[in-house]
């Protein structure tokens, strides 16, 4: 028997291009068809792009010139162009505050949007000015902190500052609701689509069978909470199931203190059947902030992003069974969101402009105080 071939060395993902943007973005998502990218912005709009694959350049084969005595001088090397462009489409408007949550329907060309004033809406994604399919301006009393869609596309789950977790049909009809004991910061569907997990201000995570109207197993993520003097500091930001629903991940921050919140990015892994915590990771120190988003790659690893103090951000690849990420990129500042293209070959990160030093920055020559903005960084994952 011949010896097995050694595993190919890991090749880090390659940044193809950073696409500029004039506003800060909270979240970005590729459509399931892969043809669109949408992002929720901090001025009450949804930004849209068409994902355009460039044709591969043709290669000219030069025939030998026997009469040439001297080789032609070498031309300066041109910077490599991105094989993909994000072509801007008109914004979607009619929202308030921050558009912090969006979700695509897994089959229909439909986008669901939630804002920080409590509005929930569904709209088409194609066309210059698509009209909403439906809107609910009072889906929650204030801030909708998280929006999730079931894998079968039948239901939406929302949670908010009003302590409610609500289940809706994707046609906008309220199906079930549960009032938690604290503000709810995250919600996600289990793969079968009939159960959700939600997590609150103090890091208590609960399973809820919304069809049977029954609460189920609880998980202790209280390390993602801190009572700092009179302030409850909430660190939970991300909930997601992996391994076909056998494992639940909870991500966010282990707060170091209140006020100007600092904390270390943290990720917890739980066994769903027993509620037992299996793993716990810290990705830096107090200035590094939060794990703000996670995407599951088909090859079994996670793509995580973090954001902390101005200029502090990480993109990481982590295998759930390992102690450390096998790839870390610190060149992209304050990563708010990550979305994996459906082909698994590319991902996009909504981040922050560099030199985003907040209050105290110098004015421009004409006396303007420039706000921050969120470039969208497009990466290509090398084939193994």
Give the role of each language-model region.
Residues 1-384:
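WD40-repeat beta-propeller superdomains and closely related acidic/aromatic-rich repeat-like regions
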């Amino acid at each position: 028997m011949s010896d097995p071939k050694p595993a190919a060395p890991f090749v880090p993902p390659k940044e193809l291009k950073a696409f500029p943007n004039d506003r800060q973005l909270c979240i970005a998502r590729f459509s399931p068809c892969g043809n669109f990218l949408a992002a929720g912005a901090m001025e009450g709009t949804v930004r849209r792009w068409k994902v355009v694959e460039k044709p591969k350049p043709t290669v000219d084969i030069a025939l030998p010139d026997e009469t040439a005595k001297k080789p032609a001088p070498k031309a300066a090397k041109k910077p490599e162009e991105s094989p993909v462009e994000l072509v801007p489409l008109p914004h979607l408007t009619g929202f308030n505050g921050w558009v912090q949550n969006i979700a695509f329907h897994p089959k229909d060309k439909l986008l669901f949007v939630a804002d920080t004033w409590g509005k929930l809406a569904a709209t088409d994604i194609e066309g210059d000015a698509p009209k909403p399919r439906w809107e609910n301006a009072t889906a929650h009393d204030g801030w909708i902190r998280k929006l999730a869609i079931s894998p079968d596309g039948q239901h939406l789950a929302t949670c908010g500052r009003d302590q409610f977790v609500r289940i809706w049909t994707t046609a906008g009809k309220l199906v079930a609701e549960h009032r938690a004991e604290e503000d709810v910061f995250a919600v996600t569907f289990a793969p079968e689509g009939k159960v959700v997990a939600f997590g609150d201000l103090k890091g208590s995570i609960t399973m809820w069978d919304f069809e049977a109207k029954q609460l189920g197993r609880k998980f202790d993520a209280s390390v993602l909470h801190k009572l700092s003097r009179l302030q409850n500091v909430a660190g939970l930001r991300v909930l997601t199931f992996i391994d076909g629903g056998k494992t639940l991940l909870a991500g966010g921050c282990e707060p170091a203190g209140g006020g100007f919140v600092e904390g270390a990015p943290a990720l917890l892994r739980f066994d769903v059947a027993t509620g037992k915590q299996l793993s716990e990771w810290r990705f830096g120190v107090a200035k590094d902030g939060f794990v703000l988003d996670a995407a599951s790659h088909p090859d079994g690893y996670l793509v995580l992003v973090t954001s902390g103090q101005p200029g502090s951000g990480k993109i990481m690849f982590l295998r759930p069974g390992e102690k450390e990420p096998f790839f870390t990129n610190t060149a992209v500042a304050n990563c708010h969101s990550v979305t994996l293209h459906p082909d698994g070959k590319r991902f996009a990160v909504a981040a922050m402009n560099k030199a985003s030093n907040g209050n105290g920055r110098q004015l421009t020559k004409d006396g303007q105080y420039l706000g921050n903005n969120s470039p969208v960084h497009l990466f290509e994952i090398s084939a193994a």
